[in-house]
Swiss-Prot record:
This is Phospho-N-acetylmuramoyl-pentapeptide-transferase. It comes from Pseudomonas putida (strain W619). Its cofactor is Mg(2+). It is found in: Cell inner membrane. GO terms for cellular component: plasma membrane.
Length: 360
């Protein structure tokens, strides 16, 4: 929106041409979203408290979590609002990738909103039935996958890139749709499973989103892409504005979500942010790198799968409780220790992911 204004004003002063730089608009995206989140946060928390939109806590969970009951939830709406406004202000609104990621994010956020709303109304932690949640995730995920497949200008946009191996690529063809579906839906649910402790999900999301922003910037520049031997995806660089907005909104939300949390993001935030990460990774052809950088999300998801499979097959549990962050809590780790150690692991994994740019 403001990019169009800047383009118009260039005829009066050449200084407005500076807004053509992606790096500047990415930074402005961060600052705008951060400012919005910090400004609107207190108002949203008060509104949620007044309307008694509080978190329902599982009775079979860690006893320390019972004190969290009633903490305002659905704070993810704050994150999505800040991301949306900042992106609309600073991104090129003629870019199809910007709209694809925005729409997918908001649609998955809508699923989460319904889920959270039902939890609040029914005053339990069940929410939207799983079958309906996965149905709508599948509808939106498949729609995005088919759209990206049909609008891909070249086969580069539908080829799987294997990190660390410069000459290994796998043409996917129609298999791109299947992979994209699993990446988007899987990422959405993985972030949601991780969102069980104060600040646990949002900081890894910010770190992974920031790293993906770097991939977007490099993949959208033909010279950088050729030099680094990564896919050149025209237009993908514009997603650095969205990634910047995600960083700013995430950090602004963390201000209120840090231990002890004043507000929880809820499914409206977790499902949306996970879907956003998955969609961005697909666009810049870095699905495997997302798997590496989002290792905490993967670990949380695998712990649930292993726990359920083990209990159904043998009647025994592998972990004291799943997702795995609860396992460490029940082992006696204080909540802040679990959170910070998971953050540290994410820093390491993100650095490994970024290292794939040169280690080939």
């Amino acid at each position: 929106m403001l990019l169009l204004l800047a383009e118009y004003l260039q005829q009066f002063h050449k200084g407005f041409a500076v807004f053509q730089y992606l790096s500047l608009r990415g930074i402005l995206g961060v600052l705008t979203a951060l400012s919005l989140a910090l400004w609107l946060g207190p108002w949203m928390i008060r509104t949620l408290q007044i309307r008694q939109i509080g978190q329902a806590v599982r009775n079979d969970g860690p006893q320390s979590h019972l004190s969290k009951s009633g903490t305002p939830t659905m704070g993810g709406a704050l994150i999505l609002s800040a991301i949306g406004i900042s992106t609309l202000l600073w991104a090129d609104l003629s870019n199809r990738y910007v709209w694809t990621v925005l729409i997918v994010t908001l649609l998955f956020g809508a699923i989460g909103w319904v889920d959270d709303y039902r939890k609040v109304i029914e005053k339990n932690s069940r929410g939207l039935p799983s079958r309906w949640k996965y149905f709508w995730q599948s509808v939106f995920g498949l729609t995005a996958a088919i759209f990206l497949y049909q609008t891909a200008p070249t086969t580069v946009e539908t080829t799987l890139i294997v990190p660390f191996l410069k000459d290994v690529t796998i043409p996917l063809g129609i298999g791109f749709v299947v992979l994209t579906y699993f990446v988007i839906v899987g990422s959405s649910n993985a972030v949601n499973l991780t969102d069980g402790l104060d600040g646990l999900a949002i900081m890894p999301t910010v770190m992974v989103g920031g790293a993906l922003g770097i991939f977007c910037y490099l993949s959208g520049n033909v010279k950088f892409a050729e030099y680094l031997l990564i896919p050149y995806v025209p237009g993908s660089g514009e997603l650095i504005v969205f990634c910047g907005a995600l960083i700013g909104a995430g950090l602004g939300f963390l201000w209120f979500n840090t231990y002890p949390a004043q507000v929880f993001m809820g499914d409206v935030g977790a499902l949306a942010l996970g879907a956003a990460l998955g969609t961005i990774a697909v666009i810049v052809r870095q699905e495997i790198v997302l798997f590496i950088m989002g290792g905490i999300f993967v670990m949380e998801t695998l712990s649930v799968v292993i726990q359920v499979a083990s209990f159904k097959l043998t009647g025994k549990r592998v972990f004291r409780m799943a997702p795995i962050h609860h396992h460490f809590e029940l082992k006696g780790w204080p909540e802040p220790r679990v959170i910070v150690r998971f953050w540290i692991i994410t820093v390491i994994l993100v650095l490994i992911g970024l290292a794939t740019l040169k280690l080939r």
